[in-house]
Amino acid sequence: MNVKVYNLDGSEKGAIELPSVFETEYRPDVIKRAVISSLTARLQPKGSDPLAGYRTSAKSIGKGHGKARVRRTAQGAGAFVPQAVGGRRAHPPKVEKILFERINRKERLKALASAIAASANSEIVAARGHKIEGVPSLPLVVNAEFESLVKTKEVLSVFKALKLEADLERAKDGIKIKAGRAKLRGRKYKKPRSVLVVVGDACDAVAASRNLAGVDVITANDLSAIHIAPGTMAGRLTLWTENAIEKLKERF
């Protein structure tokens, strides 16, 4: 299957043959497993001190005193039990708990291939919430000269020429302050995902693109399901460079 390649000004340059990965069957169930596996891989097992709340000389006075049979200190204050100040926790976190959802290597690659194919389906991309009115084609492939851009304003001009500005505005306007304790823990804002830029190798365009609201940049070799299907939802609006397409041909 061939797809058009666009210059930085939005004009057509020619065509490029897509790898067969863009024809993979859409499997949202496999994609979800792969993304969850990537998310849970970040978690660190944790547990409480086995002796937490147990370091006390408190003893129970037994029955027949008209009071609860909890362990008490010499002053009569309850201790040791979960409802007492300084007592143990009823169900503390266990280091033995399995936090990481494991996934087979072939299944993970199948999920990535399926997510890549979904990014070329206009119905799936639109259903995810992206603004694709006026976008020339999907998948959207741009000239390799894009990787040499240094300034963010240069990248923005390319996005405008390719009719991606509406989706950038959607992401910018969708930034909201979260409710709850997240504001105090370094994750104050909820930020929608916009365009994913996939380049061939590390280049100047990486730093130039990532400063735009909702835009992420990744190399073709580092691309995984969590990038192209964030939140387990496939169909992210993706901009590919010619070099990235060639790297995909080598990878799949």
Curated annotation (Swiss-Prot):
Full protein name: Large ribosomal subunit protein uL4
Keywords for the protein's UniProt record, in alphabetical order: Ribonucleoprotein, Ribosomal protein, RNA-binding, rRNA-binding
Assembly behavior: Part of the 50S ribosomal subunit.
NCBIfam families for this protein: rpl4p_arch
Family (UniProt): Belongs to the universal ribosomal protein uL4 family.
Listed GO CC annotations: ribonucleoprotein complex; ribosome
Gene Ontology annotations of biological process type: translation
Role description: One of the primary rRNA binding proteins, this protein initially binds near the 5'-end of the 23S rRNA. It is important during the early stages of 50S assembly. It makes multiple contacts with different domains of the 23S rRNA in the assembled 50S subunit and ribosome. Forms part of the polypeptide exit tunnel.
InterPro entries (UniProt xref): Ribosomal_uL4 (IPR002136), Ribosomal_uL4_dom_sf (IPR023574), Ribosomal_uL4_euk/arc_CS (IPR013000), Ribosomal_uL4_euk/arch (IPR045240), Ribosomall_uL4-arc (IPR019970)
Ribonucleoprotein among keywords: yes
Keyword Ribonucleoprotein in annotation: yes
Single GO MF descriptor: structural constituent of ribosome
